């Protein structure tokens, strides 16, 4: 009898836990995805802060030339970064217990792999948590779909690209100048500026900014007046009010006359879907582009594509970009190899004798 009561009590305790986890009455929704999200993101954040402040230099290229990234080793907020895991480790799973000592783990850049893998798992769970909360509230799932764009972008630069290149040392450093270095080297090795998927991403980001500014300014300019001249226009809105707070007909008429009639949305729902879809699709394409360039399917190459009747090259902007790419390539990892891959790939002329 006692055993039965104890089992029922433990079941009710588990039931209470399940109800608490999935309750939409909590100030912050946890959810089953949150059970995994919270520890992974806390781990990634904690290790990032500690490593950014105090991690020793890391042998990123695997040639016994460690690179400093932390504040206590001479960096500032701009130059500091979590240095990627050493090329000597490659794509191996490198937890602390795989190293002979903590010093060796730090020297080989173990914190980078720990942070990145926990972070990617955490943001994926955050996306799942968005879907889970939407489901509990009877909402449509598009919030999680929109968040999939930055999740895809982060996965591309932190996981897919290192897999394609064969080493976590090729992943994006976790810092400001490290991000810029990653971008410059990526351009040098993959000509990303000439990749159509990157172009779509640029159109998505800049276009999304433009459309957001246009929408916000149109709405703000066509508010229905509810206040006097001496009050803020924002005081004319009450949270949860049923009536429209701005005149969509006026906004539609203004923009239709500014550009042309069919450039202006007359349906608020389709307008807001467009505002969400444009940048999301653009960033999806950029993430896909990074993932293809990870396996060296690079941007377009129009170098020396224009010649005169004598066969002499007439330089175009593509050739100027190529010259810049070569310059960037010979300067990065300058002690790791004698020649950049593009220059070393030329066949040696055969000799007679």
Curated annotation (Swiss-Prot):
One of its GO terms (biological process) is photosynthetic electron transport in photosystem II. The D1/D2 heterodimer binds P680, chlorophylls that are the primary electron donor of PSII, and subsequent electron acceptors. It shares a non-heme iron and each subunit binds pheophytin, quinone, additional chlorophylls, carotenoids and lipids. D1 provides most of the ligands for the Mn4-Ca-O5 cluster of the oxygen-evolving complex (OEC). There is also a Cl(-1) ion associated with D1 and D2, which is required for oxygen evolution. The PSII complex binds additional chlorophylls, carotenoids and specific lipids. The record marks 161 as: Tyrosine radical intermediate. Fe cation binds at residues 215, 272. Keywords: Acetylation, Calcium, Chlorophyll, Chloroplast, Chromophore, Electron transport, Herbicide resistance, Iron, Magnesium, Manganese, Membrane, Metal-binding, Oxidoreductase, Phosphoprotein, Photosynthesis, Photosystem II, Plastid, Thylakoid, Transmembrane, Transmembrane helix, Transport. GO terms for cellular component: chloroplast thylakoid membrane; photosystem II. It is found in: Plastid, Chloroplast thylakoid membrane. Gene3D superfamilies: Photosystem II protein D1-like (1.20.85.10). Tyr-161 forms a radical intermediate that is referred to as redox-active TyrZ, YZ or Y-Z. SUPFAM superfamilies: Bacterial photosystem II reaction centre, L and M subunits (SSF81483). The modification Phosphothreonine is found at residue 2. The chain crosses the membrane at residues 29-46, 118-133, 142-156, 197-218, 274-288. [CaMn4O5] cluster binds at residues 170, 189, 332-333, 342, 344. The modification N-acetylthreonine is found at residue 2. InterPro entries: D1/D2, Photo_II_D1/D2_sf, Photo_RC_L/M, Photo_RC_L/M_CS, PSII_D1. Signal peptide: none annotated. Chlorophyll a PD1 binds at residue 198. Chlorophyll a ChlzD1 binds at residue 118. Residues 345-353 form a propeptide. A quinone binds at residues 215, 264-265. The keyword Transcription regulation does not apply. HAMAP family: PSII_PsbA_D1. PSII is composed of 1 copy each of membrane proteins PsbA, PsbB, PsbC, PsbD, PsbE, PsbF, PsbH, PsbI, PsbJ, PsbK, PsbL, PsbM, PsbT, PsbX, PsbY, PsbZ, Psb30/Ycf12, at least 3 peripheral proteins of the oxygen-evolving complex and a large number of cofactors. It forms dimeric complexes. Belongs to the reaction center PufL/M/PsbA/D family. This is Photosystem II protein D1. It comes from Populus trichocarpa (Western balsam poplar).
């Amino acid at each position: 009898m006692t055993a039965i009561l104890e089992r029922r009590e433990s079941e009710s305790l588990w039931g209470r836990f399940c109800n608490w986890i999935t309750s939409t009455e909590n100030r912050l929704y946890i959810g089953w995805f949150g059970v995994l999200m919270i520890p992974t993101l806390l781990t990634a954040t904690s290790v990032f802060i500690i490593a950014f402040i105090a991690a020793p230099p890391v042998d990123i290229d695997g040639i016994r030339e460690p690179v400093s990234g932390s504040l206590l080793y001479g960096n500032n907020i701009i130059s500091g970064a979590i240095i990627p895991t050493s090329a000597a480790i490659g794509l191996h799973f490198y937890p602390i217990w795989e190293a002979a000592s903590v010093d060796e783990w730090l020297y080989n850049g173990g914190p980078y792999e720990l942070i990145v893998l926990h972070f990617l798992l955490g943001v994926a769970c955050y996306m799942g948590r968005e879907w889970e909360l939407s489901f509990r509230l009877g909402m449509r799932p598009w919030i999680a779909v929109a968040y999939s764009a930055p999740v895809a972008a982060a996965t591309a630069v932190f996981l897919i690209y290192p897999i394609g290149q064969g080493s976590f040392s090729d992943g994006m450093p976790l810092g400001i100048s490290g991000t810029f270095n990653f971008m410059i080297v990526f351009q040098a090795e993959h000509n990303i500026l000439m990749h159509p998927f990157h172009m779509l991403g640029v159109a998505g980001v800049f276009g999304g900014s433009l459309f957001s500014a246009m929408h916000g300014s149109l709405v703000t300019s066509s508010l229905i007046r509810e206040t006097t001249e001496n009050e803020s226009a924002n005081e004319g809105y009450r949270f949860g009010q049923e009536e429209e707070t701005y005149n969509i007909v006026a906004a539609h008429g203004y923009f239709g006359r500014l550009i042309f009639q069919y450039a202006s949305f007359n349906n608020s729902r389709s307008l807001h879907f467009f505002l969400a879809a444009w940048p999301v699709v653009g960033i999806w394409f950029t993430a896909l582009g990074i993932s293809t360039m990870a396996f060296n399917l690079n941007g377009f190459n129009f170098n020396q594509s224009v010649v005169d009747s004598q066969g002499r090259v007439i330089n175009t902007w593509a050739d100027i970009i190529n010259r810049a790419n070569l310059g960037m390539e010979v300067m990065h990892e300058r002690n790791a190899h004698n020649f950049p891959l593009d220059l070393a790939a030329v066949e040696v002329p055969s000799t007679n004798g």
